[in-house]
Amino acid sequence: MGGLDNFCNDPTAAQKIVLAFSITYTPIMIYALKVSRGRLLGLLHILIFLNCSFTFGYMTYVHFHSTHRVALTLGAVVALLWGVYSLTESWKFITSRCRLCCLGRRYILAPAHHVESAAGLHSISASGNRAYAVRKPGLTSVNGTLVPGLRSLVLGGKRAVKRGVVNLVKYGR
C-alpha cells in the first residue's frame, strides 16, 4: 500500500485510500445486513454496491498488471456478485422511497410497509408485497399487529386500497 512519506506526491493515493476502505469495511457492512432493517438496510446496500463496484473496477485494472491472476479473478467475481445483489436491493429501496414521496410529504420518512391508523403510522412486517388483514367486530389486525382505527395500508410504497378479499376503504372509515 505504501507509507505516509510519499503520500502527497503519489498520484494514486486517493485510490489506495478508497481501496483500503472498501476492503476493510465492506465485509463489516455485509455482516451488518443481518441486523439492519428499513432505511438503514437500504443505505447499507447502496454503500456496499459503491464499494463493490470500485473494488471490482480496481481488481480488473490490476488484473492485467499482476502475476496473481487467479486470486484477483476470484476476488473480482465475488465483488461482482455482491455488487449485482446490492444493486437490485438498492433499486428496490430507491423505488419504494420514490413511491412514498409520491404519496405525500408525511410519507417521506415512513417505513415502506406500514399501516395508517387513528394513532399514526405503524410499521408492519410484510413478506414481499403481501399482508393479511383480519377484520372482526372491535378488532382489526394486519399481519398479527393490532391496529386501532385502520385508515390505509401501504405495501412497498404503494397504497393497498382494494387488494385481495378485503376492501380496506370500507373497513377503514
Swiss-Prot record:
Belongs to the arteriviridae membrane protein family. Residues 1-12, 61-69 are virion surface. Keywords: Disulfide bond, Host membrane, Membrane, Transmembrane, Transmembrane helix, Viral envelope protein, Virion. This is Membrane protein. The chain crosses the membrane at residues 13-33, 40-60, 70-90. It is found in: Virion membrane; Host membrane. One of its GO terms (cellular component) is virion membrane. It comes from Porcine reproductive and respiratory syndrome virus (isolate Pig/United States/SD 01-08/2001) (PRRSV). Its main location: virion. The gene is M. It comes from the Viruses. Residues 34-39, 91-173 are intravirion.
